[in-house]
A protein has these predicted regions:
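Face-selective signature of the C-terminal outer-membrane beta-barrel domain
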Residues: 1-82, 105, 109-110, 163-165, ...
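Outer membrane beta-barrel strand-and-loop segments of large Gram-negative receptors
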Residues: 1-7, 42-46, 50, 147, ...
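Residues on the lipid-exposed face of transmembrane beta-strands in outer-membrane beta-barrel proteins
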Residues: 4-10, 53-59, 100-104, 154-160, ...
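Transmembrane beta-strands of outer-membrane beta-barrel pores
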Residues: 12, 23-29, 59-63, 72-78, ...
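Transmembrane beta-strands of outer-membrane beta-barrel proteins
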Residues: 17-21, 66-70, 98, 111-113, ...
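Outer-membrane beta-barrel translocator domains and adjoining extracellular loop/strand segments
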Residues: 29-38, 78-86, 124-132, 137-138, ...
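Outer-membrane beta-barrel signature, preferentially recognizing the C-terminal barrel domain
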Residues: 45-48, 88-91, 119-173, 191-204, ...
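Conserved C-terminal beta-signal and adjacent last beta-strands/turns
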Residues: 100, 241-364
């Protein structure tokens, strides 16, 4: 991976105008060797050039702040198998992504309304055509013909004292779904892969959080709901997956004398649908930690128990064409950890920029 990024800003018309560019080049080899010959060994290569240009203008008025931006992305994707260029799976994408936001203060309430168009590109493992052996009934592979997901998002947010609120409505095009298809006539073998969903998927999310400070206690309570509108084909009938799911988290820290800090974090999520998966039970966890600092916080020792009630277990159903998967996962995440940390050099970095190629690193 090679990446470079440049941003220039200047005053213009009472506001600030910024232009920039980011270029990344990625070369990835993906070799899968199966000596038992359950599936054929395969050797693939991906080369991707991503060139981006963007411009943004910000200006403040007595009645509010405006921000306007436009981003252009050019992506050249080349796919190779056994060092041979595969033309039908190599593509070029050119997209424009605008964004606009307006923020103002209504009394004591700070509000913002924003519209953003953005993309989520598939991970490189999702783009690999190598076939992986899961078990005697299941094979798995990526899909080099995947298109990037395009998201149009409209968000209204507000803040008052220690309360924050967010309402969001989005339309997602070409969402990448995990999908299963039967390989042979007797339905004994299934190929799991990824596919783009051709129809646009609406989604609504709402979150409310509170972050007060009460003496030595700093609680953070957050509740939210997410609902999608999605109907998939399932054994030649339509399966509607529009069940909303609710989440809640309650994180707490207590700063005590003598450098002690106690943390108590909890999370819970209800049953509900996300993409073509339905989680059919509520799950969550509780974590507890105690931290002691020494030497003006240069040295710290932390004792932490994760999932102390052993409740982080999920079960879900996946609906995809002629394939149905029910999976129950009981992760062994109940653990006790001891962390000793010493800060050798606490001087702040003078570097003021942002990292180039961060989105590409996340796709690796």
């Amino acid at each position: 991976l090679a990446a470079g990024k440049l941003t220039l800003s200047m005053p213009l018309g009472g506001g600030t105008f910024a232009v920039g560019s980011e270029v990344t080049y990625t070369h990835r080899n993906d070799d899968y060797i199966n000596e038992e010959n359950y599936v054929p060994s395969s050797f693939s290569k991906i080369e991707e050039l991503n060139a981006t240009g963007y411009a943004e203008y910000n200006r403040s008025f007595p009645w509010g702040d405006w921000s306007l931006g436009l981003r252009y992305e050019h992506v050249k994707f080349d796919y190779y198998e056994d060092d041979k260029h595969i033309d039908e799976q190599s593509r070029t994408f050119d997209n424009f992504f605008p964004n606009i936001s307006f923020s103002t203060k209504l009394g004591a309430v700070q509000t913002q309304l924003s519209y953003t168009a953005k993309t989520q590109r598939p991970s490189y493992s999702q783009l690999s055509n190598n076939v992986y052996y899961s078990d005697r009934f299941t094979l798995q592979k990526g899909n080099p013909t995947l298109r990037p997901t395009i998201i149009h998002d409209l968000t209204l947010s507000g803040a008052w004292r220690f309360l924050q609120m967010s309402l969001s409505y989005s339309q997602t095009k070409d969402l990448i779904l995990f999908w299963g298809e039967l390989v042979n006539d007797d339905a004994s073998l299934t190929m799991l892969s990824n596919r783009n969903w051709d129809e646009s998927i609406p989604m609504f999310t709402a979150f409310l959080s509170a972050t007060p400070k009460i003496g030595c206690w700093s609680p953070m309570l957050s509740v939210g709901v997410q609902k999608q509108w999605l109907t998939v084909d399932y054994f030649k009938v339509q399966k509607t997956l529009d069940n909303p799911f609710f989440t809640a988290s309650f994180n707490n820290t207590w700063e005590l004398p003598l450098g002690f800090m106690i943390g108590l974090d909890s999370y819970i999520q209800s049953a509900g649908a996300t993409q073509n998966i339905y989680n059919d039970k509520t799950y969550g966890y509780v974590n507890l930690s105690v931290r002691k600092s020494f030497l003006n916080d240069a040295l710290s020792v932390e004792l932490k128990g994760n999932d102390i009630f052993n409740t982080n277990k999920i079960s879900y159903s996946m609906y995809s064409g002629d394939y149905y998967l029910y999976q129950k996962s009981a992760w062994d995440r109940q653990e006790f950890a001891v962390t000793v940390r010493y800060k050798f050099n606490t001087a702040k970095s003078k570097y003021k920029g942002t990292g180039a190629g961060d989105s590409q690193k996340n796709r690796m």
